[in-house]
């Protein structure tokens, strides 16, 4: 299961609101937070569980424990991922946080990415690293981010979460890091000449922060 589309009805509703060009500023940002929460809850479905017995005030009950919640590291790619990760943290409140700052470079019509800041917690073999970026467009930024994760350590699981991805971005990530699990809310068909996803939702960072 390298790629999973999150088809939860509320996630698809929120995506529609984010795509709408008339959704402005704070509403866009709040939408990313809400969507991050839903995506987080969907991710938890793919965590292992075990049966446990607990004492209630009136007796005993059998339930489940979710394994690995205390081993999650969320790495956010600034700045569009900030509200998205705020939502993810509702599902993973114990997560440790890492930050990567990157900028696009265009030279001679070629788009590249430069990572100019990276601060990631120590990664151990039992850890689950979630790399979050709302837009998985060319996949260049994401592969750079994964490189930074592996500089720190080798996780047990590597998960990429995005709102919208393209086949190009997915292929670039999986061709270099086939062990990656990718969760997205939608896959859009193409990129324009500026490497933005079409139809996409525009520049997520600019729209979230009204810049």
From Swiss-Prot:
Positions bound to uracil: 197, 202-204
Cofactor(s) needed: Mg(2+)
Pathway: Pyrimidine metabolism; UMP biosynthesis via salvage pathway; UMP from uracil: step 1/1
Descriptive protein name: Uracil phosphoribosyltransferase
Function, in words: Catalyzes the conversion of uracil and 5-phospho-alpha-D-ribose 1-diphosphate (PRPP) to UMP and diphosphate.
InterPro entries: PRibTrfase_dom (IPR000836), PRTase-like (IPR029057), Upp_A (IPR034331), Ura_phspho_trans (IPR005765)
Name of encoding gene: upp
Residues annotated as binding 5-phospho-alpha-D-ribose 1-diphosphate: 79, 104, 133-141, 203
EC class of the enzyme, as a word: transferase
Organism of origin: Pyrobaculum islandicum (strain DSM 4184 / JCM 9189 / GEO3)
GO molecular function: GTP binding; magnesium ion binding; uracil phosphoribosyltransferase activity
Binding site for GTP: 30-34
